[in-house]
Structure formats: structure tokens, C-alpha cells
Amino acid sequence: MTINLILLSLLAYVIGSIPSGLWIGKIFYKKDIREFGSGNLGATNSFRVLGIKAGSIVTVMDILKGTVATLLPFFFQLNVDHHFWLLTGAFAIIGHSFPLFAGFRGGKAVATSAGVILAYAPLLFVAALVVFLVTLKLSKYVSLSSMIGALAALIISLFMGDWILIVLVACIALFVIWRHRANITRIRNGEEPKIKWM
């Protein structure tokens, strides 16, 4: 069982490493999104550089990376406690952030982390998504909405009584905020781009 779990965790990392934005940009738009906008491989920069259609596809793909990776123990009928689903999910987040296929320079882990939560705690995902969308509607800042959504997920998880989930969501929230530190500076300086499509 231990070997199988290790293998699934490695597979989850590989799944997380799929650079959706990079590949879609290069294949369909002949653009390397690392050379435009924020230079980030995530969904937000895909929206900014490639447009709403491509950005939406990248977002869905990045969410699915987290969801599929989290459910790997279920798909392979591995007889482990469901908390181990969070382990494979965590490896997908690591893969997305430090992708094997993109020089270990990845995204900010928001969408893939959301996919992990979707697979493990769907109601928590919905609640955090609502907070994200409301914040996005009011502020027009994707970065700010992502951070507030992550913090909301942490606060809500505290009432769920699942301490392993709480620890993971706390790590996700801290990591998301850390990855957005440049965005925080730009928001303070009034230099952070706002979305125009919502």
C-alpha cells in the first residue's frame, strides 16, 4: 500500500505539472505566456494574455488537475483512509507550482488548490468560490479575490472539524498569499491591473 501511495503521489505531481496555460498559448496562439503580462503560467495571466476563452479553458484544466489527482486513490481503488486523498492532491499543487514540464516555474496554485478542495470537500469549494466571485465583482482584482477566497476557505474549514483538511487549507492559504506578494505591492501602489469583463 505504501509503495502504491508513493507511486500515486508521483503521478499526482506529474498531473499537476501539466502547464495548461503554456501549452494552450503555444499550440493555439503561438504565444509563450511567460513572456507577456505577469509572466506567470496560471489562469489569471492566461486570461490577460490569451483572452476569456483560453483563460476559461486553462482555469477548468487547472481545477481538474487538482480534482483528478485528489481522486487517484479512489480511481485506483487504493484501500486507504480518505485523508490520503489530500496527500495526492497536495502533490498536484506542488506540481502546478513547480512543474516538471516548465522549468519548475509554475502558477500560483489557486485553481489547482480549488480542484483539490472540490474533490475532497465540495461544499467548502462552493462557499470559497462564492466569496471569490463576490470579491471579484466588487474589487475587479483577481489576485485580491484569490487571497480572500483562500482565507475564507480556511475560516470555513475551521468549523468542519477535519484537522487534516484544516492544516492543508492553512498551508494553501499561506502559500497563495506568499505567491501573490508582488500583487500585494502593486495593489498598494495602485498598479495592479483590474479585469474589465465582469
Swiss-Prot record:
GO terms for molecular function: acyl-phosphate glycerol-3-phosphate acyltransferase activity. It catalyses: an acyl phosphate + sn-glycerol 3-phosphate = a 1-acyl-sn-glycero-3-phosphate + phosphate. It is found in: Cell membrane. It is a multi-pass membrane protein. Pfam families: G3P_acyltransf (PF02660). The chain crosses the membrane at residues 5-25, 56-76, 84-104, 114-134, 158-178. One of its GO terms (cellular component) is plasma membrane. Pathway: Lipid metabolism; phospholipid metabolism. Its EC number is 2.3.1.275. Its main location: membrane. One of its GO terms (biological process) is phospholipid biosynthetic process. Keywords: Cell membrane, Lipid biosynthesis, Lipid metabolism, Membrane, Phospholipid biosynthesis, Phospholipid metabolism, Transferase, Transmembrane, Transmembrane helix. It comes from the Bacteria. It is an enzyme of class 2 (transferase). Probably interacts with PlsX. Belongs to the PlsY family. Catalyzes the transfer of an acyl group from acyl-phosphate (acyl-PO(4)) to glycerol-3-phosphate (G3P) to form lysophosphatidic acid (LPA). This enzyme utilizes acyl-phosphate as fatty acyl donor, but not acyl-CoA or acyl-ACP. This is Glycerol-3-phosphate acyltransferase. It comes from Listeria monocytogenes serovar 1/2a (strain ATCC BAA-679 / EGD-e).
